[in-house]
Curated annotation (Swiss-Prot):
This is Serine--tRNA ligase. Its EC number is 6.1.1.11. GO terms for molecular function: ATP binding; serine-tRNA ligase activity. The gene is serS. Belongs to the class-II aminoacyl-tRNA synthetase family. Type-1 seryl-tRNA synthetase subfamily.
Amino acid sequence: MLDLKAVAADFESFERRLARRGEGAVQALAPVKPLAARRRELNVLLEKQKKEQADANANIRQLARTDKDAVEGARASLRALGDEVKKTEAALGEVEAELTRLLMLVPNPPSDSVPDGKDEHDNVVVRTWGEKKAYGFTPKPHWELGEALGVLEWQQAAKLSGSRFTILKGAAARLERAIVSFFIDVHTSRGYTEILPPYLVTGETMTGTGQLPKFEEDLFKTTNEPPMYLIPTAEVPVTNMHRDEIFEANAMPVSYCAFSPCFRAEAGSAGRDTRGIMRQHQFHKVELVKLSKAEESDAEHEKMLDDACEVLRRLGLHHRVSLLCTGDMGFSSAKTYDIEVWCPGQGAYREISSVSNCEDFQARRIRVRYRGENGKPRLAHTLNGSGVAVGRTIVAILEQCQEADGTVVIPEPLRPYMGGLERIAAETFPRGVER
Protein backbone atom coordinates (compact mmCIF):
# COMPACT_ATOMS: atom_id res chain seq x y z
CA MET A 1 0.00 0.00 0.00
CA LEU A 2 1.19 3.52 -0.74
CA ASP A 3 2.01 6.03 1.98
CA LEU A 4 -1.03 8.30 2.28
CA LYS A 5 1.00 11.25 3.58
CA ALA A 6 3.46 10.97 0.70
CA VAL A 7 0.66 10.69 -1.88
CA ALA A 8 -1.19 13.69 -0.42
CA ALA A 9 2.00 15.76 -0.35
CA ASP A 10 2.90 15.11 -4.01
CA PHE A 11 -0.05 13.55 -5.82
CA GLU A 12 1.22 14.47 -9.29
CA SER A 13 4.49 12.60 -8.74
CA PHE A 14 2.67 9.38 -7.89
CA GLU A 15 0.31 9.91 -10.81
CA ARG A 16 3.27 10.18 -13.20
CA ARG A 17 4.95 7.09 -11.79
CA LEU A 18 1.78 5.01 -11.91
CA ALA A 19 1.04 6.17 -15.46
CA ARG A 20 3.97 3.98 -16.52
CA ARG A 21 1.85 0.97 -15.54
CA GLY A 22 -1.05 2.07 -17.72
CA GLU A 23 -4.30 3.98 -17.51
CA GLY A 24 -5.84 1.51 -15.06
CA ALA A 25 -3.30 2.39 -12.38
CA VAL A 26 -3.94 6.12 -12.84
CA GLN A 27 -7.69 5.56 -12.61
CA ALA A 28 -7.22 3.59 -9.38
CA LEU A 29 -5.35 6.53 -7.86
CA ALA A 30 -7.71 9.27 -9.10
CA PRO A 31 -10.38 9.04 -6.32
CA VAL A 32 -7.66 9.47 -3.70
CA LYS A 33 -6.97 13.11 -4.60
CA PRO A 34 -10.30 14.73 -3.59
CA LEU A 35 -10.53 12.59 -0.47
CA ALA A 36 -6.99 13.51 0.54
CA ALA A 37 -7.96 17.19 0.16
CA ARG A 38 -11.06 16.60 2.29
CA ARG A 39 -8.87 14.90 4.90
CA ARG A 40 -6.62 17.96 5.04
CA GLU A 41 -9.65 20.23 5.49
CA LEU A 42 -11.00 18.09 8.32
CA ASN A 43 -7.61 17.95 10.04
CA VAL A 44 -7.36 21.75 9.89
CA LEU A 45 -10.90 22.09 11.23
CA LEU A 46 -10.25 19.56 14.00
CA GLU A 47 -7.08 21.34 15.06
CA LYS A 48 -9.00 24.63 15.16
CA GLN A 49 -11.84 23.10 17.19
CA LYS A 50 -9.45 21.51 19.68
CA LYS A 51 -7.70 24.84 20.17
CA GLU A 52 -11.09 26.42 20.79
CA GLN A 53 -11.76 23.65 23.33
CA ALA A 54 -8.52 24.36 25.12
CA ASP A 55 -9.24 28.10 25.12
CA ALA A 56 -12.78 27.47 26.42
CA ASN A 57 -11.44 25.30 29.25
CA ALA A 58 -8.98 28.01 30.20
CA ASN A 59 -11.78 30.59 30.10
CA ILE A 60 -13.96 28.47 32.41
CA ARG A 61 -11.12 28.21 34.93
CA GLN A 62 -10.75 32.00 34.82
CA LEU A 63 -14.51 32.58 35.18
CA ALA A 64 -14.63 30.25 38.18
CA ARG A 65 -12.41 32.77 39.97
CA THR A 66 -13.96 36.01 38.68
CA ASP A 67 -17.55 35.48 37.45
CA LYS A 68 -19.15 32.29 38.73
CA ASP A 69 -22.54 33.24 37.28
CA ALA A 70 -21.11 32.98 33.75
CA VAL A 71 -19.55 29.54 34.27
CA GLU A 72 -22.63 27.48 33.43
CA GLY A 73 -23.15 29.27 30.12
CA ALA A 74 -19.50 28.76 29.24
CA ARG A 75 -19.77 25.07 30.07
CA ALA A 76 -22.81 24.72 27.81
CA SER A 77 -20.80 26.29 24.99
CA LEU A 78 -17.93 23.89 25.74
CA ARG A 79 -20.27 20.90 25.56
CA ALA A 80 -21.58 22.09 22.20
CA LEU A 81 -18.01 22.51 21.00
CA GLY A 82 -17.24 18.97 22.21
CA ASP A 83 -20.12 17.67 20.12
CA GLU A 84 -18.67 19.44 17.08
CA VAL A 85 -15.27 17.87 17.75
CA LYS A 86 -16.85 14.41 17.88
CA LYS A 87 -18.64 15.04 14.58
CA THR A 88 -15.42 16.17 12.92
CA GLU A 89 -13.50 13.19 14.31
CA ALA A 90 -16.20 10.83 13.02
CA ALA A 91 -16.14 12.44 9.58
CA LEU A 92 -12.34 12.27 9.54
CA GLY A 93 -12.45 8.59 10.52
CA GLU A 94 -14.83 7.82 7.66
CA VAL A 95 -12.64 9.66 5.16
CA GLU A 96 -9.49 7.91 6.37
CA ALA A 97 -11.20 4.50 6.20
CA GLU A 98 -12.28 5.20 2.62
CA LEU A 99 -8.79 6.42 1.72
CA THR A 100 -7.32 3.20 3.10
CA ARG A 101 -9.83 1.16 1.08
CA LEU A 102 -8.98 3.07 -2.09
CA LEU A 103 -5.23 2.84 -1.56
CA MET A 104 -5.59 -0.94 -1.20
CA LEU A 105 -6.62 -0.96 -4.87
CA VAL A 106 -3.66 1.08 -6.13
CA PRO A 107 -0.63 -0.92 -7.39
CA ASN A 108 2.98 -0.33 -6.46
CA PRO A 109 4.71 2.29 -8.65
CA PRO A 110 7.48 0.71 -10.75
CA SER A 111 11.12 1.25 -9.93
CA ASP A 112 13.00 3.69 -12.16
CA SER A 113 15.08 0.77 -13.51
CA VAL A 114 12.00 -1.03 -14.90
CA PRO A 115 11.57 -0.67 -18.69
CA ASP A 116 8.35 0.85 -20.01
CA GLY A 117 6.05 -1.43 -21.97
CA LYS A 118 2.52 -2.74 -22.43
CA ASP A 119 2.84 -6.51 -21.99
CA GLU A 120 5.17 -9.53 -22.02
CA HIS A 121 6.35 -8.69 -25.53
CA ASP A 122 8.11 -5.61 -24.13
CA ASN A 123 10.05 -7.51 -21.44
CA VAL A 124 13.84 -7.35 -21.74
CA VAL A 125 16.00 -10.49 -21.74
CA VAL A 126 18.99 -9.67 -19.53
CA ARG A 127 20.90 -12.97 -19.65
CA THR A 128 20.78 -16.59 -20.78
CA TRP A 129 22.33 -19.69 -19.24
CA GLY A 130 23.25 -22.80 -21.21
CA GLU A 131 22.42 -23.69 -24.79
CA LYS A 132 19.46 -25.22 -26.55
CA LYS A 133 20.15 -28.92 -26.96
CA ALA A 134 20.26 -30.27 -30.51
CA TYR A 135 18.02 -33.31 -30.91
CA GLY A 136 18.25 -35.86 -33.69
CA PHE A 137 14.48 -36.18 -33.52
CA THR A 138 11.46 -33.94 -33.03
CA PRO A 139 11.16 -33.36 -29.25
CA LYS A 140 7.75 -34.04 -27.76
CA PRO A 141 5.81 -31.79 -25.38
CA HIS A 142 5.63 -33.01 -21.79
CA TRP A 143 1.99 -34.04 -22.01
CA GLU A 144 2.78 -36.53 -24.78
CA LEU A 145 5.84 -37.80 -22.92
CA GLY A 146 4.00 -38.10 -19.62
CA GLU A 147 1.17 -40.03 -21.23
CA ALA A 148 3.50 -42.34 -23.17
CA LEU A 149 5.55 -43.05 -20.04
CA GLY A 150 2.38 -43.61 -18.04
CA VAL A 151 3.45 -41.20 -15.28
CA LEU A 152 1.10 -38.23 -15.86
CA GLU A 153 -2.63 -38.90 -15.65
CA TRP A 154 -5.33 -36.37 -16.52
CA GLN A 155 -8.42 -38.50 -17.13
CA GLN A 156 -8.53 -39.90 -13.61
CA ALA A 157 -7.67 -36.49 -12.15
CA ALA A 158 -10.61 -34.95 -14.02
CA LYS A 159 -12.84 -37.69 -12.61
CA LEU A 160 -11.81 -36.59 -9.11
CA SER A 161 -11.56 -32.82 -9.41
CA GLY A 162 -12.40 -31.53 -12.87
CA SER A 163 -10.08 -29.68 -15.23
CA ARG A 164 -6.60 -28.32 -14.43
CA PHE A 165 -5.63 -31.14 -12.08
CA THR A 166 -3.07 -33.91 -12.63
CA ILE A 167 -2.18 -37.20 -10.95
CA LEU A 168 1.54 -37.98 -10.89
CA LYS A 169 2.35 -41.69 -10.82
CA GLY A 170 5.43 -43.80 -10.21
CA ALA A 171 8.65 -42.11 -11.28
CA ALA A 172 6.94 -38.72 -11.77
CA ALA A 173 5.71 -38.73 -8.17
CA ARG A 174 9.19 -39.71 -6.97
CA LEU A 175 10.68 -37.00 -9.18
CA GLU A 176 8.45 -34.36 -7.60
CA ARG A 177 9.56 -35.36 -4.09
CA ALA A 178 13.18 -35.41 -5.20
CA ILE A 179 12.95 -31.93 -6.71
CA VAL A 180 11.42 -30.48 -3.54
CA SER A 181 14.12 -32.00 -1.31
CA PHE A 182 16.88 -30.88 -3.68
CA PHE A 183 15.57 -27.31 -3.85
CA ILE A 184 15.25 -27.03 -0.06
CA ASP A 185 18.75 -28.47 0.46
CA VAL A 186 20.28 -26.00 -2.00
CA HIS A 187 18.52 -22.97 -0.54
CA THR A 188 19.22 -23.82 3.11
CA SER A 189 22.90 -24.29 2.18
CA ARG A 190 22.82 -20.71 0.85
CA GLY A 191 21.52 -19.16 4.08
CA TYR A 192 17.73 -19.58 3.95
CA THR A 193 15.79 -20.92 6.94
CA GLU A 194 13.28 -23.60 6.02
CA ILE A 195 9.63 -22.92 6.92
CA LEU A 196 6.61 -25.20 6.65
CA PRO A 197 3.70 -22.72 6.81
CA PRO A 198 -0.09 -23.09 7.17
CA TYR A 199 -1.94 -23.55 3.89
CA LEU A 200 -5.11 -21.81 5.11
CA VAL A 201 -4.88 -18.16 6.14
CA THR A 202 -7.15 -15.32 7.18
CA GLY A 203 -8.36 -12.43 5.06
CA GLU A 204 -6.05 -10.10 6.98
CA THR A 205 -3.09 -12.24 5.95
CA MET A 206 -4.15 -12.20 2.29
CA THR A 207 -4.55 -8.42 2.50
CA GLY A 208 -1.04 -8.06 3.92
CA THR A 209 0.64 -9.31 0.76
CA GLY A 210 -1.80 -7.69 -1.67
CA GLN A 211 -4.01 -10.58 -2.81
CA LEU A 212 -6.98 -8.90 -1.15
CA PRO A 213 -9.08 -6.97 -1.77
CA LYS A 214 -8.31 -6.69 -5.48
CA PHE A 215 -7.81 -10.34 -6.50
CA GLU A 216 -10.39 -12.27 -4.50
CA GLU A 217 -11.77 -13.97 -7.63
CA ASP A 218 -8.39 -15.69 -8.09
CA LEU A 219 -8.56 -17.34 -4.66
CA PHE A 220 -10.21 -20.41 -3.19
CA LYS A 221 -11.89 -19.83 0.18
CA THR A 222 -13.95 -21.68 2.75
CA THR A 223 -17.65 -21.01 3.22
CA ASN A 224 -17.57 -20.33 6.96
CA GLU A 225 -17.59 -16.77 8.32
CA PRO A 226 -15.13 -15.23 8.39
CA PRO A 227 -13.73 -17.27 5.49
CA MET A 228 -10.29 -18.82 5.39
CA TYR A 229 -8.28 -18.73 2.15
CA LEU A 230 -6.15 -21.43 0.53
CA ILE A 231 -2.75 -19.89 -0.16
CA PRO A 232 -1.83 -19.14 -3.80
CA THR A 233 1.86 -19.13 -2.78
CA ALA A 234 3.89 -19.57 0.42
CA GLU A 235 4.84 -15.90 0.03
CA VAL A 236 1.53 -15.08 1.75
CA PRO A 237 1.99 -16.82 5.12
CA VAL A 238 5.77 -16.45 5.28
CA THR A 239 5.82 -12.69 4.57
CA ASN A 240 3.05 -12.18 7.14
CA MET A 241 4.87 -14.14 9.87
CA HIS A 242 6.47 -10.95 11.17
CA ARG A 243 3.42 -8.69 10.97
CA ASP A 244 3.55 -5.94 13.62
CA GLU A 245 7.18 -6.74 14.52
CA ILE A 246 10.31 -4.59 14.70
CA PHE A 247 13.75 -6.06 13.95
CA GLU A 248 17.10 -4.79 15.11
CA ALA A 249 19.16 -3.65 12.12
CA ASN A 250 21.80 -6.34 12.65
CA ALA A 251 19.15 -9.07 12.21
CA MET A 252 18.52 -8.06 8.59
CA PRO A 253 18.14 -9.53 6.07
CA VAL A 254 15.78 -12.30 7.18
CA SER A 255 15.74 -15.12 4.61
CA TYR A 256 13.25 -17.99 4.36
CA CYS A 257 12.51 -20.84 1.97
CA ALA A 258 9.20 -22.67 2.15
CA PHE A 259 7.69 -25.63 0.33
CA SER A 260 3.91 -25.60 -0.03
CA PRO A 261 1.04 -26.54 -2.28
CA CYS A 262 -0.42 -23.53 -4.07
CA PHE A 263 -4.08 -23.10 -4.99
CA ARG A 264 -5.26 -20.75 -7.74
CA ALA A 265 -8.66 -20.34 -9.36
CA GLU A 266 -6.97 -19.18 -12.60
CA ALA A 267 -9.80 -16.74 -13.28
CA GLY A 268 -9.42 -15.29 -16.76
CA SER A 269 -7.24 -18.18 -17.98
CA ALA A 270 -9.90 -19.98 -20.02
CA GLY A 271 -8.33 -21.52 -23.11
CA ARG A 272 -4.73 -20.99 -21.94
CA ASP A 273 -2.45 -23.98 -21.33
CA THR A 274 -5.31 -26.46 -21.30
CA ARG A 275 -2.91 -29.35 -21.99
CA GLY A 276 -0.25 -30.54 -19.61
CA ILE A 277 0.70 -29.23 -16.18
CA MET A 278 1.75 -25.65 -16.90
CA ARG A 279 -1.37 -24.01 -15.42
CA GLN A 280 -3.06 -25.94 -12.61
CA HIS A 281 -5.51 -25.17 -9.82
CA GLN A 282 -3.16 -26.99 -7.43
CA PHE A 283 0.62 -27.22 -7.74
CA HIS A 284 3.74 -27.30 -5.59
CA LYS A 285 6.39 -24.65 -5.25
CA VAL A 286 9.41 -23.76 -3.15
CA GLU A 287 9.19 -20.07 -2.31
CA LEU A 288 11.97 -17.68 -1.27
CA VAL A 289 11.10 -14.72 0.98
CA LYS A 290 13.32 -11.98 2.37
CA LEU A 291 12.87 -9.02 4.70
CA SER A 292 15.57 -6.46 4.00
CA LYS A 293 16.81 -3.03 4.96
CA ALA A 294 15.53 -0.44 2.49
CA GLU A 295 19.01 0.52 1.33
CA GLU A 296 19.98 -3.12 0.72
CA SER A 297 16.89 -4.46 -1.06
CA ASP A 298 18.20 -3.94 -4.61
CA ALA A 299 21.29 -6.03 -3.83
CA GLU A 300 19.19 -8.65 -2.03
CA HIS A 301 16.90 -8.80 -5.07
CA GLU A 302 19.83 -9.68 -7.32
CA LYS A 303 21.04 -12.30 -4.81
CA MET A 304 17.60 -13.89 -4.62
CA LEU A 305 17.46 -14.04 -8.42
CA ASP A 306 20.82 -15.82 -8.45
CA ASP A 307 19.63 -18.24 -5.75
CA ALA A 308 16.58 -19.16 -7.84
CA CYS A 309 18.71 -19.62 -10.96
CA GLU A 310 21.21 -21.75 -9.05
CA VAL A 311 18.89 -24.76 -8.79
CA LEU A 312 18.34 -24.69 -12.56
CA ARG A 313 22.07 -24.37 -13.23
CA ARG A 314 22.77 -27.41 -11.05
CA LEU A 315 20.12 -29.38 -12.92
CA GLY A 316 21.65 -28.31 -16.24
CA LEU A 317 18.40 -26.77 -17.49
CA HIS A 318 18.77 -24.10 -20.17
CA HIS A 319 16.97 -20.91 -19.14
CA ARG A 320 16.96 -17.15 -19.50
CA VAL A 321 16.18 -14.18 -17.25
CA SER A 322 13.85 -11.37 -18.35
CA LEU A 323 13.26 -8.02 -16.66
CA LEU A 324 9.52 -7.39 -16.75
CA CYS A 325 8.25 -4.16 -18.24
CA THR A 326 5.84 -1.84 -16.45
CA GLY A 327 2.80 -3.36 -18.16
CA ASP A 328 3.58 -6.96 -17.15
CA MET A 329 4.44 -6.52 -13.47
CA GLY A 330 2.47 -7.92 -10.56
CA PHE A 331 0.32 -5.64 -8.40
CA SER A 332 2.61 -5.52 -5.35
CA SER A 333 5.95 -5.47 -7.14
CA ALA A 334 8.23 -2.51 -7.79
CA LYS A 335 10.58 -4.63 -9.93
CA THR A 336 10.33 -8.23 -11.16
CA TYR A 337 12.55 -10.66 -12.99
CA ASP A 338 11.06 -13.74 -14.66
CA ILE A 339 13.15 -16.88 -15.05
CA GLU A 340 12.02 -18.69 -18.18
CA VAL A 341 13.02 -22.28 -18.86
CA TRP A 342 13.35 -23.63 -22.38
CA CYS A 343 10.68 -26.20 -23.33
CA PRO A 344 11.77 -27.74 -26.67
CA GLY A 345 8.59 -29.80 -27.04
CA GLN A 346 6.61 -26.55 -27.01
CA GLY A 347 9.26 -24.56 -28.86
CA ALA A 348 9.05 -21.80 -26.26
CA TYR A 349 10.52 -20.37 -23.09
CA ARG A 350 8.06 -20.74 -20.20
CA GLU A 351 8.07 -18.90 -16.89
CA ILE A 352 9.31 -21.06 -14.02
CA SER A 353 9.88 -18.30 -11.46
CA SER A 354 9.12 -14.64 -10.76
CA VAL A 355 11.49 -12.84 -8.39
CA SER A 356 10.16 -9.52 -7.08
CA ASN A 357 11.21 -6.61 -4.91
CA CYS A 358 8.06 -5.11 -3.36
CA GLU A 359 10.05 -2.45 -1.50
CA ASP A 360 7.89 -1.11 1.39
CA PHE A 361 4.52 -1.75 -0.34
CA GLN A 362 3.68 -4.94 1.58
CA ALA A 363 5.57 -3.88 4.71
CA ARG A 364 3.28 -0.87 5.13
CA ARG A 365 0.27 -3.20 5.14
CA ILE A 366 1.74 -5.66 7.64
CA ARG A 367 3.67 -3.03 9.63
CA VAL A 368 6.98 -4.91 9.68
CA ARG A 369 9.89 -2.61 10.51
CA TYR A 370 13.52 -2.46 11.59
CA ARG A 371 15.48 0.08 13.58
CA GLY A 372 17.52 2.40 11.39
CA GLU A 373 20.84 4.01 12.28
CA ASN A 374 19.14 6.55 14.56
CA GLY A 375 17.15 3.81 16.31
CA LYS A 376 13.89 5.01 14.77
CA PRO A 377 11.67 2.23 13.30
CA ARG A 378 11.65 2.16 9.51
CA LEU A 379 9.57 0.03 7.15
CA ALA A 380 11.38 -3.05 5.89
CA HIS A 381 11.47 -4.03 2.24
CA THR A 382 9.95 -7.40 1.29
CA LEU A 383 11.16 -9.64 -1.51
CA ASN A 384 9.82 -12.93 -2.83
CA GLY A 385 10.48 -15.38 -5.60
CA SER A 386 9.81 -18.94 -6.66
CA GLY A 387 12.82 -21.08 -6.01
CA VAL A 388 11.32 -22.59 -8.19
CA ALA A 389 7.94 -24.02 -9.32
CA VAL A 390 8.14 -27.80 -8.93
CA GLY A 391 5.63 -28.87 -11.60
CA ARG A 392 7.23 -26.65 -14.20
CA THR A 393 10.62 -28.10 -13.31
CA ILE A 394 9.17 -31.52 -14.14
CA VAL A 395 7.99 -30.07 -17.45
CA ALA A 396 11.49 -28.77 -18.19
CA ILE A 397 13.16 -32.07 -17.26
CA LEU A 398 10.75 -34.14 -19.36
CA GLU A 399 11.18 -31.90 -22.39
CA GLN A 400 14.89 -31.00 -22.16
CA CYS A 401 16.12 -34.42 -21.01
CA GLN A 402 14.09 -36.66 -23.35
CA GLU A 403 15.81 -39.28 -25.47
CA ALA A 404 15.00 -40.68 -28.91
CA ASP A 405 13.76 -43.95 -27.35
CA GLY A 406 11.12 -42.05 -25.34
CA THR A 407 12.91 -42.29 -22.00
CA VAL A 408 13.90 -39.26 -19.92
CA VAL A 409 17.33 -38.89 -18.32
CA ILE A 410 17.14 -37.76 -14.68
CA PRO A 411 19.59 -34.91 -13.91
CA GLU A 412 22.47 -36.22 -11.78
CA PRO A 413 21.80 -34.04 -8.68
CA LEU A 414 18.35 -35.65 -8.32
CA ARG A 415 19.47 -39.28 -8.56
CA PRO A 416 20.51 -39.64 -4.89
CA TYR A 417 16.98 -38.55 -3.93
CA MET A 418 15.52 -41.25 -6.21
CA GLY A 419 17.51 -44.26 -5.05
CA GLY A 420 20.03 -43.91 -7.87
CA LEU A 421 17.43 -44.05 -10.66
CA GLU A 422 19.03 -42.68 -13.84
CA ARG A 423 16.15 -42.46 -16.26
CA ILE A 424 12.38 -42.60 -16.47
CA ALA A 425 11.08 -45.39 -18.68
CA ALA A 426 7.52 -46.40 -19.51
CA GLU A 427 5.55 -47.79 -16.58
CA THR A 428 2.31 -49.75 -16.46
CA PHE A 429 -0.17 -49.25 -13.64
CA PRO A 430 -3.33 -51.21 -12.73
CA ARG A 431 -6.40 -49.89 -14.50
CA GLY A 432 -9.97 -51.14 -14.48
CA VAL A 433 -12.48 -50.91 -17.30
CA GLU A 434 -14.81 -47.92 -17.39
CA ARG A 435 -18.42 -49.02 -17.04
